[in-house]
Curated annotation (Swiss-Prot):
Protein name: Transcription antitermination protein NusB
Signal peptide: none
UniProt-listed GO biological process terms: DNA-templated transcription termination; transcription antitermination
Gene: nusB
SUPFAM superfamilies the UniProt entry points to: NusB-like
Disulfide bonds: none
Biological function: Involved in transcription antitermination. Required for transcription of ribosomal RNA (rRNA) genes. Binds specifically to the boxA antiterminator sequence of the ribosomal RNA (rrn) operons.
Keywords recorded for this protein, A-Z: RNA-binding, Transcription, Transcription antitermination, Transcription regulation
Amino acid sequence: MSLARTLARRAAVQAVYQWQLARDSLPDIERQFVEELQLAKSLYRRHAEGFELSPPEREQLEELLEKFGRSQGTDEVEEEDVTLEQRASQCQVPDVQVGYFKELLHGVANNLALLDAALAKYLDRPIDEVDPVERAILRIGCYEFMRRPETPYRVILNEAINLAKEFGAAQSYRYVNGILDRVAHECRAVEMAARRRG
């Protein structure tokens, strides 16, 4: 599991969520996220090299690390009590595979009918009634099952579960796991059978 891909999925969930709710244009959403990623990398690098950031830059970096950085396991500290230094030391550099982020964002949007049809067989309600965070995660996971056969299904499933734990409601990871596991059995039948045999 590549950290850069994990962070690309994390950014894609947020971008797909934004697209689902606001229906902003994909190029606008993509541009916003790519610009924010570039700014996060630049500010993080300057901070890590010991350069003094201005108060607005520090605030931006804190927000961007929260949005794009992946925590390495923080203590039980209230989010608003975490200083920039603590957050930076507890986060991995926001080194997102931008190409993969773009593929996921556009792949979901361009294959929406196909993805929703594959998911609908296993949903307990219409796709539009699924929580928007869960819906974004399900669509991205389904896209990867269908279009990224080189990525093992367990990686895709585990990443989706982790995203649901991070962004979703308390038990949403169970729902995401149940739906995507069934989709995997359909889309990755050969891989699943080989795993059971071996």
